[in-house]
Amino acid sequence: MIDIPDALIATQSKYNGETGRAFLAALPGRAAEFLERWGLRPDGAALHGMCALVLPVVREADGRPAALKLQPVDEETAGEPVALRVWGEAGAGAVELLDHDPATGTMLLERLDSGRPLAGVADEREAVRVLAELLARLSSVPAPAGCGLRRLGDVVARMLEEAPGAVEALSDEAERRLLADCAAAVREVAGEPGDRVLHWDLHYGNVLAGGAADCGAALQDRERGPDREPGRGGWGAVDHRTADDRWVAIDPKPLVGDPGFELLPALVNRFDAAAVRWRFDLMTEALGLDRERERARAWTLGRLLQNGLWAVSDGERRLEPEQVEIARLLLGRG
């Protein structure tokens, strides 16, 4: 029998309503089912994020530490095992998928060290460099034909349909112009949405050091609050890395598209207005986008539009100040 954390109960009930409550009700039985089906034994206290429950386990057949991840299947999570398999075949640096049940979305993942996230690296430039290099590996992988992942072209089409109403809903005239300019920028590149497998939310908290010292490879949503924007927090005081560390990407919300759509989390997470330009330049260079910076800029403005649309849909009439500052800088108004 597992104990479901109160915080997971609260978030599932608040944000997913009846669907969330049904997921919670099924969790104890589902956990027991997969512990038995996949030959696993519990190996520590359960962890959770906004939507997932993660159980540290050991695979009895070979003694391998692993992480059993149970989460609802929705538009964002449905593609996670697909992307992990594609990246795994390419050796791109994502957490290894050991097993998966398509009917429930349950996954068995390699166990990483949640006590050593990239966010704990004190040297900001080194952390951005590691993130950029990992992102370059992930976004270099073409999406296989018929993979079923959601596509950036479809996402952007919906965004552009919603943009005029969202612009009108904002109470600040300058922010209305800013959001309209974000929409105009992404409209220019929407006709070529790209064909790479994107992580969508790769930032410092979604990169962990390899190793099974702790369960956490599958700990979801450490990066995003209810507003669905990348998380915040200060740089760690201690650099936890060793020379042998293998940095691994976790928690993708994958889609197929242009790598330029991947840059915003690295700009807004651990926000520093003075760092936006050099982070953007470093990221575009690492991803091979330095000759197409205008295109990367447009896609990043598209991500800002996406966040703005979500804010308005949540009832907000002002944009997040950090989002406004990044948009101003990318539009040359900072």
Residue ranges of predicted features:
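Conserved NTP-binding catalytic cores of kinases and kinase-like/nucleotidyltransferase enzymes
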Residues: 1-94, 210-223, 228-247, 330-334
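Helix-rich C-terminal or lid/interface subdomains of diverse kinases
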Residues: 8, 12-24, 28-29, 258-261, ...
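An alpha-helical support segment within catalytic cores of ATP-dependent transferases
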Residues: 23-35, 140-200, 210-211, 244-245
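Hydrophobic residue at the +6 position relative to the catalytic HRD Asp in the kinase catalytic loop
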Residues: 205-207
